[in-house]
């Protein structure tokens, strides 16, 4: 499995948990952008 695909899956999982967390999701998305 290509590392890029693994990275996309990890980001998708993070985004999903961020949405599930509600208001906290915005800060999580900012962290993803900075990271």
Swiss-Prot record:
Keywords: Amidation, Secreted, Signal, Toxin. Expressed by the venom secretory cell of the spine. The spine is a cuticular structure containing a single large nucleated venom-secreting cell at its base. It is an independent unit capable of producing, storing and injecting venom. On the back of D.vulnerans caterpillars, spines are grouped together by 50 to 100 to form scoli, of which there are eight in D.vulnerans. Residues 1-20 form the signal peptide. The modification Leucine amide is found at residue 34. It is found in: Secreted. One of its GO terms (cellular component) is extracellular region. One of its GO terms (molecular function) is toxin activity. Belongs to the limacoditoxin-13 family. Probable toxin. Shows a moderate antiparasitic activity against the major pathogenic nematode of ruminants (H.contortus, EC(50)=94.5 uM). Does not show insecticidal and antimicrobial activities. Does not induce increase in intracellular calcium in mouse DRG neurons, suggesting that it does not induce pain. This is U-limacoditoxin(13)-Dv73. The lineage of its organism: Eukaryota, Metazoa, Ecdysozoa, Arthropoda, Hexapoda.
């Amino acid at each position: 499995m290509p590392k890029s695909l693994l990275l996309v899956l990890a980001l998708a999982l993070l985004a999903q948990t961020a949405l599930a967390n509600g208001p906290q999701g915005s800060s999580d998305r900012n962290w993803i952008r900075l990271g």
